[in-house]
Amino acid sequence: MVLTGPPQRESVSMVKRVSMLDQHKKSSCARVRVAVRLRPYMEEKEEDKVPTACVRGLDSHSLEIVNWRNQLETMQYQFDAFYGDSASQREIYMGSVCHILPHLLIGQNASVFAYGPTGAGKTHTMLGNPDQPGVIPRAVRELLQMTRMAASAPENENWTYTITMSYVEIYQEKVMDLLEPKNKDLPIREDKDHNILIPGVTLKTINSFGDFDEHFIPASQNRTVASTKLNDRSSRSHAVLLIKVQKSQQVAPFRQLIGKLYLIDLAGSEDNRRTGNQGIRLKESGAINSSLFTLSKVVDALNQGLPRIPYRDSKLTRLLQDSLGGSAHSVMITNIAPEQTYYFDTLTALNFAAKSKQIINKPFSRETTQTVAQPAMKRPREEAEATTSSRQRKKSKTDSTESSPNSSMESTGKRKLNLASLDSAVVERLLKLDKILTEKGKKEAQLLSTPKRERMALLKKWEESQMEIERLKEKQKELEQKAMEAEARLEKSNNSDLSDSSVSENTFRAPLRGRNTSTAKVKKVLRVLPMQGNSQLQSTIEEGIPVFEKKKKKQVTCDGHENQPTWEMNMRTDLLESGKERILKLLNTGSVKELKSLQRIGDKKAKLIIGWREVNGLFKNVEELECLEGISAKQVSSFIKANILSSISS
């Protein structure tokens, strides 16, 4: 079905200007207002010039478009405003834009951006021409008039108004300055108050509309445009004009109100099959479509109430963060085309506009107060350096005072107390007390000058160190007690077998007297403890002390000669067997966690043991660990010794 009927003329009513007080009394929530503008039908170059429009307006708020699934049906859309193909630039400005400008004078933000497919008339809506100026020149002109009228009002006698402008474009995900082109990608930042700003961007002060024209017209020519099959002057970037209004109080308390107006001309989405883009144009089109897709994701996330809004996924949405779901009074002008060839582009734009009008912003006034008498705030690093230097001066002064105590004390005595009349012992105690108080005062002053967070961290660290010291003291007492008990038992055993030791020593020394000392070879004897008899060994076993025997071992060299004897430690047989039984029981019944409690058994070996046990059954002895892959006999031997020694020491 083709809509060929003439579009209805919409009735345009003048918008009532609301005072700043009434604006301030309004609710803090403001929905994004969406207006749709239909571009006039452009005649085709074919012989058949009968208009074949796919969309038409119903009234000043609604329109209908053919349903592509069933051309006998139409789909209707309702918006805050609809402007037909005969609507003028002034009607659009007065109907949708001018009512948000008074918010700037009370420190609130506002934004106007044009959205739509390529060739739908977005740039014409925002810029216009000398005969029909668009939204940008009309808004700037009226804003200048409003500030002049507000400055001349009696209630604003002590207030001044300053208007500055900056103009940037987002070209292939790079923020470029248009007022002073530098071929440099400018960063986008967010301050502590969640305000979006562009450090390093050029700011120009404008006092009249002539100043604005002087800066804006050359900057607009710096914007990247190119010719495609659908548009002779297609914008290849998103243009963002920022107008900042600063209201400053000249008397105490020196308040400042800052309002920002964003005027944004978005680049249109493109179908490269129709535009015929190649090379650099194809790359530009990809960047444009990607940023517009991110914009649609932001709108969907806001409507669904998702916890994360993907503002940072593109430079465009990062700049529009305040306009969509932020703190600005926002107006979106959706431009559409009536031709059948633009049907799907128009349908997509209308669906996006319908989703955008559900977004709720929360505007608020940005007010700051400046105190003239207040000194300039130091940077944290400078403040730290100043604090350090002052502490060093205090320390040097204290050191010089301590180096000459007599002179300082004499002057103090003359000023406060006559020390000559006091006893020397009393004077000495007073001097010591004064020194202690001075040191304590210095420590408290340093603690008070420390920031709260750092001070709390220091106190917490001090408490932890005190607890650690107490724990170490308790452990030291336990170790000392065990050492004393072991020493007592050892002394008792030595005293009881002193006679047996002397007899044994004489017995071993007697044969040596009859030998020729000139031919005897000196041998090394290792004595860990005095030699004990069987009774001493039995008493030691009863007391539970493990006993190790020293075994003499000779090493044989390659030529058959014996080296000097070395010593090897052998463990008591009963302890060795009981330890092996305990290990064997754990190997046959233990879980992975229990096996890992053994010395030199990790997660991998514990799983190997359980796997071998499931396949081959229980271990018959500990030495069967050699059957496991990667475990040698030497490792099994060291494993047994380590676990038995560990059980004895524990």
From Swiss-Prot:
Sequence motif Important for regulated proteolytic degradation, residues: 560-563
Record GO biological process: microtubule-based movement; mitotic spindle organization; spindle elongation
Coiled-coil annotated spans: 452-498
Region annotated Disordered, chain positions: 365-416
Gene3D superfamilies reported in the protein's UniProt record: AF1531-like domain, Kinesin motor domain
Record localization: Nucleus; Cytoplasm, Cytoskeleton
InterPro entries tied to this protein: Kinesin-like_fam, Kinesin_motor_CS, Kinesin_motor_dom, Kinesin_motor_dom_sf, P-loop_NTPase, RuvA_2-like
Family note: Belongs to the TRAFAC class myosin-kinesin ATPase superfamily. Kinesin family.
UniProt protein name: Kinesin-like protein KIF22-B
Molecular function as annotated in GO: ATP binding; ATP hydrolysis activity; DNA binding; microtubule binding; microtubule motor activity
Keyword Cytoplasm annotated: yes
Ranges of Low complexity composition bias in the record: 401-411
Residues of the Kinesin motor domain: 31-359
Processing after translation: Ubiquitinated, leading to its subsequent proteasomal degradation.
Gene source species: Xenopus laevis
Keyword Heme: no
GO annotations of cellular component type: cytoplasm; kinesin complex; microtubule; nucleus
Keywords: ATP-binding, Coiled coil, Cytoplasm, Cytoskeleton, DNA-binding, Microtubule, Motor protein, Nucleotide-binding, Nucleus, Ubl conjugation
Function: Kinesin family member that is involved in spindle formation and the movements of chromosomes during mitosis and meiosis. Binds to microtubules and to DNA.
